[in-house]
């Protein structure tokens, strides 16, 4: 036929565009999944895998948690809940929590604040955005405070400031060093000026700690911003940060919107802050206990 004469002859091998047929003559790739296969799919729990935002690697969530939430491929430091951090840091069974009964109210009758607090209680296992208490690290007593990022982004309200201040005052009574792990978006807007008071309150308490000659180590984690950066996070005798932690007063997006300027790439990272003298050292999470233990030994009362 004429169409066969003018048809272009292929000089290369080709594959059929149709999938192979199954034993019953149907198209194998278009078969519906069996009930057993469908059941298996539905039984897979949510959150089984986590994608690393830095390297893109798919990580088994259980392995990630066991590795202190540090990527096994590129060492990216994920954010970690306060109690998980605590378990990896202190001597087993040594932590005694303080002031768990303190809870936030709504002193300014801010709209929807109670609902946001209720959500925060459900998302975390702390009563406020900070966990405080006493423990030991490598056998040395220490007073600790951990911001909880899952509780309203670790924001500082009245109860947060009160718990940190009480912890510092007890450290003075006990003659113990203080370590605070900061993770916060800043002062809590729902409490207005009452939240801003906490900057002065915690700073004054740390001033009394310094007058007593007691050590304060500030550990800045991702993210540390706003009123927390402008108060207790920046008042340490020694400042440590985790790798890649974002540290500053205002985020780059807000700076761009208000100042019409863009920050240099990486300008608010822990490494940038260290290179400009704001941070003394950047420490991997897996090494944090060992480094803190060494610093506590160096600064023990009576040590040479």
UniProtKB/Swiss-Prot annotation:
Recorded catalytic activity of this chain's protein: N(6)-carboxybiotinyl-L-lysyl-[protein] + acetyl-CoA = N(6)-biotinyl-L-lysyl-[protein] + malonyl-CoA
Cofactor requirements of the protein: Zn(2+)
Keyword set includes Ribosomal protein: no
Cofactor binding note of this UniProt entry: Binds 1 zinc ion per subunit.
Subunit structure: Acetyl-CoA carboxylase is a heterohexamer composed of biotin carboxyl carrier protein (AccB), biotin carboxylase (AccC) and two subunits each of ACCase subunit alpha (AccA) and ACCase subunit beta (AccD).
Record-linked Pfam families: Carboxyl_trans, Zn_ribbon_ACC
Protein name: Acetyl-coenzyme A carboxylase carboxyl transferase subunit beta
Region (Disordered): 16-42
Gene Ontology biological process terms from the UniProt entry: fatty acid biosynthetic process; malonyl-CoA biosynthetic process
Function (record text): Component of the acetyl coenzyme A carboxylase (ACC) complex. Biotin carboxylase (BC) catalyzes the carboxylation of biotin on its carrier protein (BCCP) and then the CO(2) group is transferred by the transcarboxylase to acetyl-CoA to form malonyl-CoA.
Keywords: ATP-binding, Cytoplasm, Fatty acid biosynthesis, Fatty acid metabolism, Lipid biosynthesis, Lipid metabolism, Metal-binding, Nucleotide-binding, Transferase, Zinc, Zinc-finger
Pathway in which this enzyme or protein is active: Lipid metabolism; malonyl-CoA biosynthesis; malonyl-CoA from acetyl-CoA: step 1/1
